[in-house]
Amino acid sequence: DDGNGNPVCRDSSGGCVPWNIFERNADGTTAVTDEAAAFIAGVGIVTGETEQTVFGGTIEGDFTNMGIQSPMADAGLSGLIGFEMREDKLGRLADDISKISGGRGLTGTGGATLPIAGEIEVEEIFMEMSMPLITGKPMIQELGLTAGYRYSDYTTNGNGLSNSFDADTYFAGISWAPNDEVRFRFNQAVAIRAPNVFDLYVGINTGLVELSPVNGDGDQCSGPTPVATQAQCANTGLSAAQYGSVDPSAAGQFNLITGGNPNLVAEEGETTTFGVVITPSMIENLSVSIDYFDIEVTDAIGSVPAQTSY
């Protein structure tokens, strides 16, 4: 202050206008002036750009005329082979206000919006085939096999970091139609989901998370008898000496650190599907499909919610 209790700017070269945040008008409202409000306020601008380049090709063929067919079917093997090259780029630019947690510290916007620059390149080869086994027989109008395979080679770059990984995916299935109205199908597949640029290269950032006791998601490690065990709370950095002596947060808010991981590889899902399609001839334009799915995901890509991080 200026020695008389009035706020002053330590450095006024940037157009600083002082504001006493504790000063109130007679009606209890803040006594901030228009000039001071204009100085501390700002408009955060974030711009983004995405770009995708895809190049590929396929060759299809029917090998019935070459004699590659089942003796009990009226058609033979058909299939395709192909390749694809794909490049995905993403860029995000943030101004100075957006890159600061809470804007200028008083806007209450939470964590900072950090710039991102990254790209993912993938080269793939794939093949698919379909093979009728039996057609036009009693109780077997059509029985056939389908299968496919894809090899993917990924290269990622962003924020001066790079990584590479590959993945194999495939599927195999069988379909049986005893007549025109019913078809049963079974399929086994392995699929992947590769990490995107955000998963890989978003910067480490500290934001806010609500863990208010009001909604039942309070700090499980606070209070004299914490809900979480000492071992669980140790995962958050709480020492044994601190366990049972942490006061609940009066604000109900906590810092949460998030960020990408440039070492991520593709998550993998194994899927088993069994289904039936019913197309009753007595009801025109009606088709009913019933399917059962069993999906198991390994190396899943995601974040751990604050409520379950113990």
Where are these regions (language model features)?
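Surface-exposed, low-complexity loop segments enriched in small/polar and acidic residues
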Residues: 1-122, 162-163, 189-266, 291-310
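Outer-membrane beta-barrel proteins
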Residues: 60-74, 130-138, 143-145, 153-155, ...
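Surface-exposed extracellular loop regions of Gram-negative outer-membrane beta-barrel proteins
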Residues: 78-93, 116-177, 269-275
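Extended hydrophobic-aromatic, low-complexity segments
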Residues: 137-141, 157-159, 195-197, 284-287, ...
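Repeat-solenoid scaffold signature
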Residues: 162-194, 263-287
